[in-house]
Structure formats: structure tokens, C-alpha cells
Amino acid sequence: SKDSKYRDYYIWRDPIDGSEPNSLESCFGGSAWQYDEQSGQYYLHFFSQKQPDLNWENPEVREEVYDMMNFWIDKGIGGFRMDVIEMIGKQPDKMISSNGPKLHEYINEMNQKTFGNHDLLTVGETWGATPDIAKLYSDPERNELSMIFQFEATTLDQIDGKPKWFTKPLDVLGLKHVLSKWQTCLEDKGWNSLFWNNHDLPRAVS
């Protein structure tokens, strides 16, 4: 309902010429906009239609997230793994889905209001990070995250133009180059993450 106090917890836009507000695409395929007949508007979902994106520009949304995080911190958890953290600063009207201009402002605020004064590990998932971007997250002086994990090494065996489940033999020299680059670039500004795969990728041993 447009009258719900939670309406602005999500991202809604009016149709344009009877269709989607713009051409943003879902990571699962198709449009990132889903039409809601009851309200006559579209809501944004970069993943499943059952996972509408939160409106991080709404300070009440951010405070709700921080309250949930502090609940678990008080329970004694050891840290947080933040899925696609680079997308919380999205600006859909400008066709920006990742690395938006307020991204690091939000993460710094999160740090100050939740885990910043605790001995916790925080790791953010970033599909588009370069070493320089990674340091924006993990530089201790910036008070954001402990580290990120990125996917440059894990995508070396992918075949251009084919789904990620189709792979080619891994270039070992290329792998060494990527791992060395990240290890060197983050030497004094954060931790590098070493992993082969996750639930979004084919198994390296298959």
C-alpha cells in the first residue's frame, strides 16, 4: 500500500510510457523492475522478484539494519559477511547499480553505529572491485570493513560470451599474476581474500 509506513523502505517508481522506469536488468535475467498492480508502480529488485531492494537513502531503513546487526553483536557473533555490499549505494534513476556515490558514506556510518567498536571480522562481497577500490573498503584509516572478497581470480577460466558454467582450462601464469597483484596492492591497507569458488560459481575441481 502507498500508505504503509514501510512503503519508502523499498524503491518505487512510476511507469514511463506504460512500461518500466528504465532498462536496468536483474542479475537473474530480465528487467530489474516488477509492476505492482495494486499501487500502479514498479518496485526495484536486482535479484529475485521476492527480494525487493532496500532503499538505503531512507535513514529509517539504515537504522533498522543497524538495529539487527547490533542484536547479533550483543549475542556474541564473530563478524558479518555482507552480500553484494557494493550495491547498497545504488542510484537507479542514474542507472547506477554498484559503487554509487554514497556507498562508502553508508558503510562508514554502519561501522560507527554497529561493529566499529567491537573486535569483529567484516568482509564484503564485491564483484566489480579493483585493488584501488578495495582499499577504499579495507584501509583501516577509513573505518569501513576489515576486508573484501573479489572474483578476478575465480573468473579466469570463464569463456567470453557463454554462461559462467562453461569453463576453459585455467591459465596458471595468469592466476599467479592476479593473486600476486592483489596480495601486493593490499599489503598495508587490508587483507586479501583467497578462495576458489562460492555458491555463485562452478566448482573448480569439477
Annotate each PLM feature.
Residues 1-206:
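Active-site and adjacent substrate-binding regions of carbohydrate-active enzymes
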